[in-house]
Amino acid sequence: MSNIDLIIKKEISLDELREKIIKGYDITKEEAMQLVEAPLEDLCSVANEIRKYFCSNTFDMCSIINAKSGKCSENCKFCAQSSHYDTKCDEYDILDKEKILEQGKSDFNKGVLRYSIVTSGRALYGKEIDEVYDAIETLNKETDGYICASLGLLDEEGFNKMKNAGLKRVHNNLEASRNFFSKVCTTHTYDDKINAIKAAQKAGMVVCSGGIMGMGETWEDRIDMAIELRELGIMSIPVNMLNPIASTPFENIEPLTEDDMRRIVAIYRFINPRAFIRLAGGRGLMKDKGKSCFLSGANAAITGDMLTTAGISIETDKKMVEELGYKIELKED
């Protein structure tokens, strides 16, 4: 056995790694890969300590509205809204701004901190841009909440326009690692995603970006994506668990276990210690609705319904996270 083999097989010290991270150290891919074999309870406990050190007990809670549904030109294999698959999902154009405003006001009144307008499709085009602009502008005028949006692969000009409407944060998931991305989608590329994220950042936007776990990717893929997000400076990272949708290519994939998700969340905390790790789609499949993940490094959530699947009520989520000792409060970007 070589010296390299001995080094790789040497059990990593979680406590030593925690202390290095607290002092500002960025863990390497090799160190992150060793965490895949670390004892789960110990790993999650130390990840929670790292979360407390950098983020205290602040919890970030957001909600979304499916403001344009279905008829998407892209072929993402997980997605109910792709026109490539016969999923029978709802199809409609941009919702009336009064409807978007109504749900936003309701969610803010229930205690949500951020409210995101999400639209299907590769990007917004023509009058769609003006319609979403008007909705964002109206929300900013008539509510005190923080407005976000997920608008696909806009260019810098499009992001600048939305910024002028008062938009501060844009969501654009990487979805997967560079290596695995082509197994998820072939109608746009990983670099298209990266370019859109950088265009939003250049326009002065804060970007929220993460991915979907359980699509057949390896642990190396998951870690590669976490490191990519760190390099992009992402401070809000949605971690979705695949919810297999009938008639999509991923319909028969077995969902991950809660222990899988706990380990993923914990490793993401080690790699991105200062970020808000946000449980997102698929959380409703977990028996504990994500409670164990909120003790394993996660400190944010999308609450309420997802885009095409039922979620967990705002009231239920608030009760759970407050019982865990969190304080739901907005940390300004």
Curated annotation (Swiss-Prot):
Oligomeric and partner information: Homodimer.
Span of domain Radical SAM core: 54-283
Organism taxonomic ancestry: Bacteria, Pseudomonadati, Spirochaetota, Spirochaetia, Brachyspirales
Top-level taxonomic group: Bacteria
Residues noted as binding [2Fe-2S] cluster in the record, renumbered to the chain: 116, 148, 208, 278
Enzyme Commission (EC) number: 2.8.1.6
Recorded family membership: Belongs to the radical SAM superfamily. Biotin synthase family.
GO biological process: biotin biosynthetic process
One MF term in the entry's GO annotations: 2 iron, 2 sulfur cluster binding
Membrane in keyword set: no
Catalytic activity line of the entry: (4R,5S)-dethiobiotin + (sulfur carrier)-SH + 2 reduced [2Fe-2S]-[ferredoxin] + 2 S-adenosyl-L-methionine = (sulfur carrier)-H + biotin + 2 5'-deoxyadenosine + 2 L-methionine + 2 oxidized [2Fe-2S]-[ferredoxin]
UniProt KW Transit peptide keyword: no
PROSITE patterns cross-referenced by the UniProt entry: RADICAL_SAM
Function: Catalyzes the conversion of dethiobiotin (DTB) to biotin by the insertion of a sulfur atom into dethiobiotin via a radical-based mechanism.
SMART domains registered for this protein in UniProt: BATS, Elp3
Protein name: Biotin synthase
Pathways per UniProt: Cofactor biosynthesis; biotin biosynthesis; biotin from 7,8-diaminononanoate: step 2/2
Cofactor binding note from Swiss-Prot or TrEMBL: Binds 1 [4Fe-4S] cluster. The cluster is coordinated with 3 cysteines and an exchangeable S-adenosyl-L-methionine.
CDD domains noted in UniProt: Radical_SAM
Listed cofactors: [4Fe-4S] cluster; [2Fe-2S] cluster
Binding site for [4Fe-4S] cluster: 72, 76, 79
InterPro entries linked to this entry: Aldolase_TIM, BATS_dom, Biotin_synth/BioAB, Biotin_synthase, Elp3/MiaA/NifB-like_rSAM, rSAM
A UniProt-annotated Pfam family: BATS
